[in-house]
Amino acid sequence: MNQEYLDFELPIAELEAKIEALRAASDDKVDLTDEIKRLQKKSNELTKKTFANLDAWQVSRMARHPNRPYTLDYIEHIFTEFEELAGDRAFADDKAIVGGLARLDGRPVMVIGHQKGRSVKEKVQRNFGMPAPEGYRKALRLMEMAERFKLPIITFIDTPGAYPGIGAEERGQAEAIARNLREMAQLTVPVICTVIGEGGSGGALAIGVGDKVNMLQYSTYSVISPEGCASILWKSAEKASTAAEVMGLTASRLKELNLIDSIMQEPLGGAHRNYAKIAENLKLRLKEDLAELDELSKEELLNRRYERLMSYGYC
């Protein structure tokens, strides 16, 4: 996969291009090792400096980075024996939601998540990660299956929002989301949710009601996109950077408000720089969360989840 850079990363991109050019030019007659090491050190220092002070708008753009790992990437790196399950048994199979049975270090679990595409064809097939009602009904079907077989549920959240098309509304988009919220609140098995990219409004919440809610360092969680907020408040999407700052959509701000449990640190430069490392960190977090939740009885699990939901909105 070709590495892509955002505009605030362009100085880093220039250094990386120079490093690649030197590597290509290096041969037995010309040893450029020292110069390459010097530039690599300079690139690392510049990357640390750049990412030490990202604002909310820059974090929003990182959450949408085209190279960022998606749900299926995490499934590949974290789980074994993944068996995808399809369809809502009522209308269709929504490719914007993926899910199925898998093993986490040998333990059977149910994994569900939003899935975006990378190529134009994949993006269209996955509807840009925006599920229709049948996607949320598929997710609910898998959750109910997990409860019947007493399997923990692990969800990965990464969507700009639920699909707002006419067909989706006619098929009951709002009802599908609302039903998921109600049913997830009553599940008697552990539910762990992780925001890996964009956490867009009800489209994210529909698989986001859990006993543990974690976020990656450069992910976002909000009721609307910065562009949408800016269009409503200032009648211009160009105010998106201002909107991002006041919306409090970053992981650090949401942790301050006690809306999430933990923040997963990403590799230097973002999760897309090192899939294996971020997957390793996330796997450890999932195992720790499961171990904690396993100690609770069904009643304690439900009571804690209820108290968690009722605490939202209180300072």
Curated annotation (Swiss-Prot):
Residue stretches spanning the membrane: none
Top-rank taxon, per record: Bacteria
Catalysed reaction, written as an equation: N(6)-carboxybiotinyl-L-lysyl-[protein] + acetyl-CoA = N(6)-biotinyl-L-lysyl-[protein] + malonyl-CoA
Disulfide bonds: none
GO cellular component entries: acetyl-CoA carboxylase complex
Annotated InterPro entries: Acetyl_CoA_COase_a_su, ClpP/crotonase-like_dom_sf, COA_CT_C
Alphabetized SUPFAM superfamilies for the sequence: ClpP/crotonase
Pathway: Lipid metabolism; malonyl-CoA biosynthesis; malonyl-CoA from acetyl-CoA: step 1/1
GO molecular function terms listed in the Swiss-Prot or TrEMBL record: acetyl-CoA carboxylase activity; ATP binding; carboxyl- or carbamoyltransferase activity
GO term, biological process aspect, one: malonyl-CoA biosynthetic process
Enzyme Commission number: 2.1.3.15
Keywords: ATP-binding, Cytoplasm, Fatty acid biosynthesis, Fatty acid metabolism, Lipid biosynthesis, Lipid metabolism, Nucleotide-binding, Transferase
Enzyme class: transferase
Keyword Amino-acid biosynthesis carried by entry: no
Main location: cytoplasm
Family: Belongs to the AccA family.
Protein function: Component of the acetyl coenzyme A carboxylase (ACC) complex. First, biotin carboxylase catalyzes the carboxylation of biotin on its carrier protein (BCCP) and then the CO(2) group is transferred by the carboxyltransferase to acetyl-CoA to form malonyl-CoA.
HAMAP family, sorted: AcetylCoA_CT_alpha
Subunit and interaction comment: Acetyl-CoA carboxylase is a heterohexamer composed of biotin carboxyl carrier protein (AccB), biotin carboxylase (AccC) and two subunits each of ACCase subunit alpha (AccA) and ACCase subunit beta (AccD).
Protein name according to UniProt: Acetyl-coenzyme A carboxylase carboxyl transferase subunit alpha
Source organism of this protein record: Haemophilus influenzae (strain 86-028NP)
Lineage, highest ranks first: Bacteria, Pseudomonadati, Pseudomonadota, Gammaproteobacteria, Pasteurellales
